[in-house]
């Protein structure tokens, strides 16, 4: 926990994972093992610099995940700034890409690339990523407060229930399409055999 006039820098795994906590931030490390790092940040603001290296034994990249009250953040070797107030989480990607999903529906997610921001409110899907002008990016990075994310004109977010229903419809339509393709291939094979 950082106080009103306190900041903290946390380095894990040497210089691979660095988190700079701003004032009034609640932060917790849930797990730190050879496969992944999981942290929790219910309130506050932080800047994350994550270099994903291969786990030598398993030949795969370590995972780094951040959980807030509303969002699940999947990090892919990147740098980003995130602010959360409990009911809302905003993030700006400075380098690489970050995946943001709703805690209540992890299948509903957006990928936020370099120079883009997204916001997730309780009961909503993440907003579509929006490009943030460099001056506003600097303001967000330099400020101790999450309030600077309020200067970003985020597009409207879809209701989470609506987004989940749409996702299910798309998946069902895709399954039907795949089944039709398989049936058509089988018919073509039967015709060739005759």
Report each predicted region and the residues it spans.
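Flexible, surface-exposed loop/linker segments and immediately adjacent secondary-structure boundaries
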Residues: 1-178, 182-183, 188, 192-194
């Amino acid at each position: 926990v950082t106080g009103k006039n306190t900041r903290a820098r946390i380095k894990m795994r040497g210089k691979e994972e660095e988190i700079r906590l701003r004032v009034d931030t609640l932060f917790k490390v849930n797990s730190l093992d050879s496969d992944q790092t999981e942290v929790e940040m219910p309130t506050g603001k932080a800047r994350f610099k994550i270099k994903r290296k291969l786990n030598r034994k398993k030949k795969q990249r370590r995972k780094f995940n951040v959980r807030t009250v509303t969002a699940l953040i999947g990090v892919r070797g990147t740098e980003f700034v995130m602010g959360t107030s409990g009911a809302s989480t905003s993030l700006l990607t400075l380098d690489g890409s970050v995946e943001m999903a709703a805690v209540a529906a992890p299948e509903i997610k957006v990928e936020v690339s370099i120079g883009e921001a997204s916001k997730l409110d309780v009961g909503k899907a993440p907003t579509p990523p929006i490009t943030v002008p460099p001056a506003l990016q600097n303001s967000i990075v330099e400020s101790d407060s999450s309030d600077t994310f309020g200067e970003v004109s985020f597009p409207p977010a879809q209701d989470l229930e609506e987004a989940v229903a749409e996702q299910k419809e798309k998946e069902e339509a895709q399954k039907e399409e795949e089944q039709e393709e398989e049936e058509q291939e089988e018919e073509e094979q039967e015709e060739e055999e005759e």
